A protein has these predicted regions:
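Membrane-integrated ABC transporters
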Residues: 1-61, 76-96, 111-115, 119, ...
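Helix-loop-helix
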Residues: 78, 185-199, 269, 273-344, ...
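Alpha-helical segments in transporter systems
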Residues: 45-70, 93, 97, 112-116, ...
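Transmembrane helices of ABC transporter permease
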Residues: 42, 46-59, 96, 103-108, ...
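An intracellular "coupling" helix at the cytosolic face of ABC transporter transmembrane type-1 domains
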Residues: 41-44, 139-140, 158-165, 169, ...
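Juxtamembrane helix-loop junctions of ABC transporter transmembrane domains
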Residues: 21, 28, 60-73, 100-147, ...
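ABC-type nucleotide-binding domain
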Residues: 5, 83, 366-644
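Alpha-helical membrane-protein architecture signal
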Residues: 29-36, 45-52, 127, 147-154, ...
């Protein structure tokens, strides 16, 4: 009974392994087909030319080998022993042979050059598709995948593709042609000797198939491990100051060693099997050569099969030519498997489900006439409206954007089994400043993520000017919001370009005005090139406060109806904060503003302050009301409690 259970478990594991292998093989085939579409899609004509050139090159190589028979049997041997040999016909044959050889060289030159062009073109198309699709992915994808693992797709994986397309594929095609044409030639020269070749081929394919399956498995692991190492290094480089401050160099080295050890093991195993392929095929090829020479010699001596000296010379040359393509494929096998593993990871990103958007309400420039009727305008008027198309009768109605935001019994969790916000109901009337207070993890930033629809709620509704935000197109929704995040991100470019990122068509004067409003104008003018100062590396040349000021200016130039300030002044020193606060007060006039701040002094003038605790609203009111209440906010403000 125990033996039966063990046997059944063993059979079950075997079946599971076979199913995984079958699925892996199917994925590899599908990946190869998709790569082929990239190569033949936009480069179809070039690929056909490459195909023809490879055929010519392969045929020329075979012709040179086949010519040995005719040179020996028809030209050289008949001349032996002649007192006055005539070499004219031999010279003609050699001239023809030289032309064929030259044609093969030219064809090889053409297809190698064209494959480089095709390879770079395919990589460009793959990178374009990757980046274009990446832009459509939801924030959740980037929260779940490290920057390093994504960057690895653009660097390591695309580089393996380049090597395969420009080197491995041409050699594989060349090998395929050579094998087919050589086999036919061998069959025509001596069917008896070719039977031996078929047996050797069977053995060779059986051995290489076994080695290849093991190698492919480990090459896939190698690419995953390489992405892990790349991601870890990228994270530690970005956080090097934190590592040094907390003296975590040894801990980081220990963690890196573990990842590097995993990469070493997968790479060692992959290359162990991959590098085994060449010597194995080479030795089998040598065995075939020896057996062919022995058998061919016996047949030649006995006169069986009509084997002459010329036939033997050509056949032995074909024997070398026959195993040579297998050697070439073996040499490129590692590159092909690595590239297919990398391509599979790339296509996994491209196949990621894009951010869904079922909205149909659009944000448009508008104008209101004397009767209060709203009409759509192409030019900027300073007034915005929501455009509602009605599919039933084809009519369109407009709702003025005022900035009224309401949460109605909202429940949300980043994971369904872990709720972050529970039955949240709140409102911000047009022009109100709403502040959120609470410890880390209370749900403050989550609320702003939901307003942007970076994530969608599980229960309840969020309304914007009375419209359920799920009905508003995400691009239009986000265009109506200005955001200043706690972690400031600047792009490589001038200061002017970084501010203009908030509104790409902003004039220089609008950029300068936004900078003045954010009180960034003063420090910008003190820089050597002012607004044309070039920033790089996320603006490392600037202080944290200066970077924050630019972020605020970027939001100001967008001139949005609603502002979200996620701890916008938490990284600024007290002196700079007072300067920025004046500018922010001007910026916030007439807008609906959501503020998250640890410094409670910055939100005293808020119309409403909401205190959150573990995803629930425990207090709401203005500063004076909450101080009188003497609850959590009072304790935080007076220092009896501290925000964690």
């Amino acid at each position: 009974m125990i033996f039966t259970e063990k046997y059944m478990n063993h059979r079950s594991k075997e079946a599971e392994t076979m199913n995984k292998k079958k699925k892996l093989d199917q994925n590899t085939i599908q990946t190869a087909k998709r790569l082929l579409k990239y190569m033949t899609g936009t480069h179809k004509i070039q690929f056909i030319i490459v195909f023809i050139c490879i055929f010519i090159s392969s045929a020329a190589s075979i012709a040179v080998s086949l010519s040995l028979k005719f040179l020996l049997d028809d030209f050289i041997i008949p001349l032996i022993g002649q007192t006055d040999p005539n070499f004219a016909e031999l010279y003609k044959a050699l001239a023809v042979l030289g032309c064929i050889f030259a044609l093969g060289v030219i064809a090889t030159f053409i297809y190698t050059r064209m494959m480089v062009y095709i390879g770079q073109g395919v990589l460009k198309s793959v990178r374009d598709d990757m980046f274009e699709h990446m832009q459509t992915l939801p924030i959740r994808y980037f929260d779940q995948n490290t920057n390093g693992s994504v960057m690895s797709l653009y660097t390591n994986d695309t580089d393996t593709l380049r090597q395969m397309i420009s080197q491995a594929i041409p050699q594989a095609l060349m090998a395929l042609f050579t094998i087919v044409v050589t086999f036919i030639s061998m069959l025509l020269l001596s069917p008896l000797l070719t039977i031996l070749a078929v047996v050797i081929i069977f053995i060779m394919l059986k051995v290489t198939s076994k080695i290849g399956s093991n190698s492919g498995k480990y090459f896939i692991r190698q690419q995953v491990s390489l992405a892990d190492v790349t991601g870890f290094v990228e994270e530690r480089m970005n956080g090097q100051r934190v590592v040094k401050v907390f003296n975590h160099e040894d801990k980081s080295k220990e963690e890196f060693d573990k990842l590097n050890e995993a990469l070493f093991k997968s790479s060692a195993n992959a290359n162990k099997y991959g590098n085994m392929m060449g010597p194995v095929i080479g030795n089998i090829g040598n065995l075939q050569f020896v057996l062919t020479a022995v058998l061919g010699g016996l047949l030649s001596v006995t006169g069986v099969g009509g084997i002459t000296l010329g036939v033997m010379a050509s056949y032995l040359q074909f024997t070398k030519s026959f195993t040579q393509p297998f050697m070439q494929v073996a040499q490129q096998f590692n590159a092909i498997v690595m590239a297919l593993a990398g391509a599979e990871r790339i296509f996994r990103l491209i196949d990621e489900k894009p951010e869904e958007d079922e909205g149909y309400v659009e944000l448009v420039n508008a104008r209101k006439d004397a009767n209060g009727n709203i009409t759509e305008c192409k030019e900027r008027t300073g007034m915005w409206a929501w455009k509602h198309p009605h599919s039933a009768d084809g009519s369109v109605t407009y709702t003025e954007l005022t900035g009224d935001v309401r949460f109605e019994d909202v429940t949300f969790g980043y994971n369904p089994d872990k709720v972050i916000l529970k039955d949240i109901s709140l409102f911000a009337k047009p022009g109100q400043k709403l502040a959120f207070v609470g410890s880390t993890g209370a749900g403050k930033t989550t609320i702003t993520n939901l307003i942007n629809r970076f994530y969608d709620i599980q229960e309840g509704k969020i309304r914007y000017d009375g419209i359920n935000i799920t009905k508003i197109k995400k691009d239009d929704l986000r265009r109506s919001l200005g955001i200043v995040l706690q972690d400031t991100h600047l792009f490589t470019g001038t200061i002017k370009e970084n501010i203009r990122y908030g509104k790409l068509d902003a004039t220089d004067e609008e950029v300068y005005e936004a900078a003045r409003l954010a009180h960034a104008d003063q420090f910008i003018k003190m820089l050597p090139k002012g607004y044309d100062t070039m920033l790089s590396g996320d603006g490392e040349e600037l202080s944290q406060g200066q970077r924050q000021l630019l972020s605020i200016a970027r939001a100001a130039v967008a001139n949005p109806p609603v502002l979200i300030l996620d701890e916008a002044t938490s990284s600024i020193d007290t002196r700079t904060e007072s300067i920025v606060q004046k500018g922010m007060d001007n910026l916030m006039k007439g807008r609906t503003v959501f503020v998250i701040a640890h410094r409670l002094s910055t939100i005293r003038n808020s119309d409403a302050i909401i205190v959150l605790d573990h995803g629930k609203i425990i207090e709401r009111g203005d500063h004076e009301d909450l101080i009188k209440l003497k609850g959590t906010y009072y304790q935080l403000y007076t220092g009896k409690l501290e925000l964690s």
